[in-house]
């Protein structure tokens, strides 16, 4: 029942739908009380020979009319109630996605994709089912049960009613006991389903790698273990679930036995008539649904409550990155980076230390260094993916902490080494951040990224479908489409995180020439590269090693110093000459 309190915010919001449903249900309950009463009166009249068969027909017609009206009202009631519950599904999923979109990278490091998908789909469905069927069952069984109970006590016999309901307290105690067990067991089952969902997602994503390494049997064994564990936990839920029905049916059977035995004795003593006993048995039949519904409601509500706990545990987490309130009107500002110390969560060793540099509008900053030196970490801090422990990053003399996250990220375009493309057309992938972009704008961005000539050679040109994650394209083509996508946004700062690694030297040179024309308009460019040829024309290059800057200057200055940059540049130059030989 805790779930109804947890969802009261939605019930208040949709109070008109729920109030309308309750009013219709009260009318339905009143109408359903009439047939047993009518039949009881008719039986007594027939026994006393005060009514002929012909005179019964109008009363039968009334009973049929009541049945038709009840059917129509129940139809309207369900439309109102389930319409509200389906709207809840939409709101919960939008709220869930909205929360995820505001989270930083650390959140996704802690939470698996498959688990988040399970919470956004399966768990939401359980909550919605409880908010629909659960509310329906609660209100229906409560109104009907109370109404029937009042009629049985006031119109027939309070003594017979009390005797017939002796099994009910025992049933209520058992249902409550099983309900608590069901809540805990179902939550474990949902966690197992999340793990299964995540494993399925990982297998489907990496199926080509699994085949390439011949890991089919190994992955099948691993997947089979997870499936069996999930099935075992679901079986535990089913075992507890199976205890509800026997309790209900035994209680109902015992109630009927007591009603017939005690009712027969009351008729024998002329306390009630046969017609009233018949009405009582029919009313007791109407009580069966509330009793069955009570157990079923506890079942689905406990499942819904467990699912809500899983959803709420995600959306109730505090945001790791707090949003600022400031925006800057002036365009093309100066970026100042002053990082004294940065640690990744749970790491004792700093990932970055003593990083101090500036980037003026229209300039290019090159970043290089050994693998794992902290280059991508620096870019993540510029994007506000993590908090800086000591130090700050300024834009136009304003700390990034003061700026609204959405505003700041609209100022920067980022292209990563692994480019993600959606299963859509090339045109739609390029215009992802600017859906209303004209074809001319899309082609202009594609030309800057040196991908236009490749696109026009495809059978469907810009309308070519790239497949899931761009599987129909080469690595270099995907990178260039991602660059075009970022260029289309005309952001003040463009960040290329080793985004030229999959293109050949000639294509790289063409892109860099185009980017030089682009940044001359006042835009800033940050290039992270392992291939140092991409950094030759940068205004400043920094070399990061073990989280700190060990060299800085332009290309001409750095190749004169005997250090990491010159050593790596000479090595790559010789390697290129050998490849071209």
Swiss-Prot record:
TM region(s), chain numbering: 23-43, 53-73, 127-149, 153-175, 247-267, 280-300
Location of this chain's protein in the cell: Cell membrane
EC number(s) on file: 7.6.2.2
Ranges for domain ABC transporter: 337-571
GO cellular component: plasma membrane
CDD domains found in the cross-reference section: ABC_6TM_TmrB_like (cd18541)
Start and end residues of each ABC transmembrane type-1 domain: 18-303
Membrane association type: Multi-pass membrane protein
Binding site for ATP: 369-376
Reaction(s) catalysed by this chain's protein: ATP + H2O + xenobioticSide 1 = ADP + phosphate + xenobioticSide 2
InterPro entries assigned: AAA+_ATPase (IPR003593), ABC1_TM_dom (IPR011527), ABC1_TM_sf (IPR036640), ABC_transporter-like_ATP-bd (IPR003439), ABC_transporter-like_CS (IPR017871), P-loop_NTPase (IPR027417), Type_1_exporter (IPR039421)
Main location, first listed in the record: membrane
GO molecular function, one term: ATP binding
Keyword line: ATP-binding, Cell membrane, Membrane, Nucleotide-binding, Translocase, Transmembrane, Transmembrane helix, Transport
Similarity comment text for this entry: Belongs to the ABC transporter superfamily. Drug exporter-2 (TC 3.A.1.117) family.
Protein name per UniProt: Multidrug resistance-like ATP-binding protein MdlA
Organism: Buchnera aphidicola subsp. Schizaphis graminum (strain Sg)
Gene giving rise to this polypeptide: mdlA
